[in-house]
């Protein structure tokens, strides 16, 4: 099989976590399913076909973390409405940052910062791309 025929099926960020068990619990609250947990080693959570991977980082400082990823969803407003009642603060760590707004680059997005300082920007296309 030539390289041109190999289909890339997905991508998963690998983010730091001080406590993988606590990270799993946080993401399960957000509607992810725990796919695999190896305490003090590795965690995989899934929501639909999207996976987030985490590695143990005991010395991580959430306030200085620069890790993050972008999650494309079909409806940013609906996901924000699902997460808002969870009572996440709008400041500090963790936080549900802002409410969905339209960007100049064609996405409607908001952000979440998890307990380890990982930034997740979540967005949906305002109009079909292309």
For each of these PLM feature ranges, what is it?
Residues 10, 16, 53, 111, ...:
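Conserved beta-strand segments that form the floor/walls of ligand-binding pockets within enzyme
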Residues 6-9, 61-66, 104:
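Short glycine-enriched loop/turn motifs at secondary-structure junctions
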Residues 10-12, 49-51, 68, 95:
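Structural motif
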Residues 19, 69-119:
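Vicinal oxygen chelate
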Residues 1-22, 69, 124-130:
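N-terminal beta-strand motif that seeds the catalytic metal site of vicinal oxygen chelate
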Residues 57-58, 97, 101-102, 124-129:
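Acetyl-CoA-dependent GNAT
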Residues 7, 15-52:
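Core segments of cupin and vicinal oxygen chelate
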Residues 35-67, 119-124:
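Conserved short beta-strand elements that form part of the metal-binding/catalytic scaffold
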């Amino acid at each position: 099989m030539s390289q041109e025929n190999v289909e890339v099926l997905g991508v998963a960020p690998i983010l730091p976590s001080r406590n993988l068990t606590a990270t799993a619990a946080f993401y399960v609250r957000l509607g992810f399913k725990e796919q695999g947990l190896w305490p003090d080693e590795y965690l995989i959570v899934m929501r639909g076909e999207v996976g987030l991977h985490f590695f143990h980082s005991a010395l991580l400082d959430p306030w200085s973390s620069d890790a993050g990823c972008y999650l494309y969803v079909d409806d940013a407003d609906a996901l924000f409405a699902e997460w808002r009642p969870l009572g996440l603060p709008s400041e500090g760590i963790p936080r549900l940052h802002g409410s969905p707004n339209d960007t100049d680059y064609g996405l409607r997005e908001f952000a979440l910062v998890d307990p380890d300082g990982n930034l997740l920007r979540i967005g949906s296309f305002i109009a079909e791309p292309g």
